Swiss-Prot record:
The gene is gatC. Allows the formation of correctly charged Asn-tRNA(Asn) or Gln-tRNA(Gln) through the transamidation of misacylated Asp-tRNA(Asn) or Glu-tRNA(Gln) in organisms which lack either or both of asparaginyl-tRNA or glutaminyl-tRNA synthetases. The reaction takes place in the presence of glutamine and ATP through an activated phospho-Asp-tRNA(Asn) or phospho-Glu-tRNA(Gln). The lineage of its organism: Archaea, Thermoproteota, Thermoprotei, Sulfolobales, Sulfolobaceae. Belongs to the GatC family. InterPro entries: Asp/Glu-ADT_sf_sub_c (IPR036113), GatC (IPR003837). This is Aspartyl/glutamyl-tRNA(Asn/Gln) amidotransferase subunit C.
Length: 97
């Protein structure tokens, strides 16, 4: 199914994404979106008859068993931390100041 990327579609997408684009940005996004959708159309053209569906990329992968191990000591954990105080990591402020 070919989707026509036009001004109307772009304005709908802008509204849904709660963004406002300039005319130049809209034209750039239209070109980019057209390329992306063309790639998906190429995938649709593939003959996948006889190919088993893959539900998860790791379904046949080999994972190591989840076994408890010795954790890092506090000193080792804080060794490369740029800011710390009283044995705790100091991170950036996320509220206000």
């Amino acid at each position: 199914m070919k989707v026509q990327v036009d001004e109307e579609l772009m304005r709908k997408l802008e509204k849904l994404a709660l963004i406002s684009l300039t005319d130049q940005e809209r034209q750039e996004f239209m070109r980019d979106l057209t390329k992306i959708l063309d790639f998906f159309n190429k995938i649709d053209e593939l003959n996948l008859e006889g190919v088993e569906p893959m539900f998860h990329p790791l379904s046949t992968g080999k994972l190591r068993p989840d076994e408890p191990a010795q954790p890092l000591s506090r000193d080792d954990a804080l060794a490369n931390v740029p800011k710390k105080k009283d044995g705790y990591i100091i991170g950036p402020s996320t509220i206000g100041g």
